[in-house]
Amino acid sequence: MLLYGVPGTGKTHTVRYLLGRLPGVTVVLLSGRALRMISQACSVARTLQPAVVVVEDVDLIAEERGHNLGENPLLFELLNEMDGLGSDIDVTFLLTTNRADLLEEALAARPGRVDHAAELPVPDAAARARLLRLYQGRLDLALADRDTVIARTEGVTASFIKELLRRAALVAADEDPADASADTPIRVTDAHLNAALEQLLDTRSALTLTLLGGGPATARTANGPAG
């Protein structure tokens, strides 16, 4: 199974949720430097089956061959392990990627390797409204026009909204330090959210915006929704 979507849409959270629903199943997680140990990890999974092998950011080892010089031995290791699962082996591969467009065709399209792909899209308006409520925590979110805030965040991810509220709280605390005590919820208004949004959309924060999953629509939010 392949989970794909831009950064910040919740792929890692989804993996954790799925694994939490599988009691008694061995989980082998490959991420970062551990990606170099594909064969060893799969051997452990076969020994301790039923098992799930989670390969995070699989695009790091499975990019199109044309993007790299020479062959990718890690890619071949992964393909060999996925091909080598017989009907008597209870091992499932769960892959995640931010860049499905870069995946090796042999990995993404051949039946038996990845037989189900699920996109985690950016949240729609209703989901963004729920995320505002979820991430406000103990903040006193005093918004005069919540619908405008939701409209102005079209195209962003859950991570973006979480960071937006964090920065808005900092703006509010800087504005009135006396109101930012540990026992008093910080009051965040439309003005604070707008100021935080301007920070995130600043051209000098382009990398931060990308990492948080700020979509194309955010480019126009500095001046409000198009009309």
Segments from the language model and where they lie:
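Walker A/P-loop
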Residues: 1-30, 40-48
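Structural recognition of the conserved hydrophobic beta-strand(s) that form the central parallel beta-sheet
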Residues: 54-55, 91-98
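Substrate-gripping "pore-loop 1 plus following alpha2 helix"
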Residues: 66-87
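Flexible beta-alpha connector loops of hexameric P-loop NTPases
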Residues: 25-36, 61-73, 117-119
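A short helix-turn-beta junction within AAA+ P-loop NTPase domains corresponding to the substrate/partner-engaging
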Residues: 105-121
